[in-house]
């Protein structure tokens, strides 16, 4: 069962696990684990998507319980009236508090987008980011005897495909576990030494005006076990108090960590 973060007569929000598709497409119509169908079966109602999260990303996913609710939510997302906050663990020490305004060329899928225009101009893409913590671990990566990581808070101001992943890669601080835009040696090292085998990007919080009641609404999603183990091993527990979970302990994974 999926964790229900919020539900009322109009909306439902869940904590999407990493690795789950939001909905099926013709490319993955045989996929058995899909958020929309799982939520529908779980609450006994059809749900309507208003935004999406990449398959490897975890966190808050908000849906409507009617087509009208889905439409109103989608409009708020399109007009950037919903504030989104993410957290990521990245390569290196990213300590800035800044805004990156870096247009992105549309990222096309070779199969799904084979009929799309190839001459599209880069689209505006803006991300606010803030470094929260850094650490240097005594594990080698490539030719370096130690490995540096950073904990970063992100607020996308636009909604381009893979925007956060591509923007952080542009800053030379790719997200750990990003197989497409990241550092494969860093990914292998994080998997080997810290049991970190997922994209370390989490949609932590949505802040919006309820599209039916007009009241302020804040929805937050807790971190999964992998995130909690890494925060513990890096000495970062307590830095994300709204998202950390007390039920996950590091004992089982700490025994597997081999620092040199």
UniProtKB/Swiss-Prot annotation:
The keyword RNA-binding does not apply. It catalyses: uridine(65) in tRNA = pseudouridine(65) in tRNA. InterPro entries: PsdUridine_synth_cat_dom_sf (IPR020103), PsdUridine_synth_RluA-like_CS (IPR006224), PsdUridine_synth_RsuA/RluA (IPR006145), RluA_PseudoU_synthase (IPR050188). Keywords: Isomerase, tRNA processing. Its EC number is 5.4.99.26. The active site is at 54. Belongs to the pseudouridine synthase RluA family. This is tRNA pseudouridine synthase C. It comes from Salmonella typhi. The lineage of its organism: Bacteria, Pseudomonadati, Pseudomonadota, Gammaproteobacteria, Enterobacterales.
């Amino acid at each position: 069962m999926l964790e229900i973060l919020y539900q009322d007569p109009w909306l439902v929000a869940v904590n999407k696990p990493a690795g789950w598709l939001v909905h099926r497409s013709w490319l993955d119509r045989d996929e058995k684990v899909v958020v929309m169908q799982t939520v529908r079966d779980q609450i006994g109602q059809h749900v309507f998507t208003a935004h999406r999260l990449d398959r490897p990303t975890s966190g808050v996913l908000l849906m409507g319980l009617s087509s009208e609710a889905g439409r109103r939510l989608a409009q708020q997302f399109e007009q950037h009236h919903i504030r989104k906050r993410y957290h990521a663990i990245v390569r290196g020490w990213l300590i800035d508090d800044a805004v990156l305004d870096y247009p992105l060329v549309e990222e096309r899928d070779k199969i799904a987008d084979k009929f799309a225009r190839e001459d599209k101009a880069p689209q505006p893409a803006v991300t606010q980011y803030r470094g929260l913590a850094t650490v240097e671990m005594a594990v080698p990566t490539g030719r370096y005897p130690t490995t540096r990581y950073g904990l970063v808070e992100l607020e996308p101001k636009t909604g381009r495909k893979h925007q956060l992943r591509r923007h952080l890669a542009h800053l030379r601080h790719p997200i750990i576990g990003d197989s497409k835009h990241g550092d494969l040696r860093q990914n292998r090292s994080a998997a080997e030494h810290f049991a970190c085998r997922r994209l370390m990007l989490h949609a932590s919080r949505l802040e919006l005006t309820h599209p039916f009641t007009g009241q302020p609404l804040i929805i937050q999603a807790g971190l999964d076990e992998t995130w909690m183990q890494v925060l513990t091993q890096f000495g970062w527990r307590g830095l994300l108090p709204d998202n950390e979970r007390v039920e996950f302990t590091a004992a089982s994974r700490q025994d597997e960590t081999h620092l040199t």
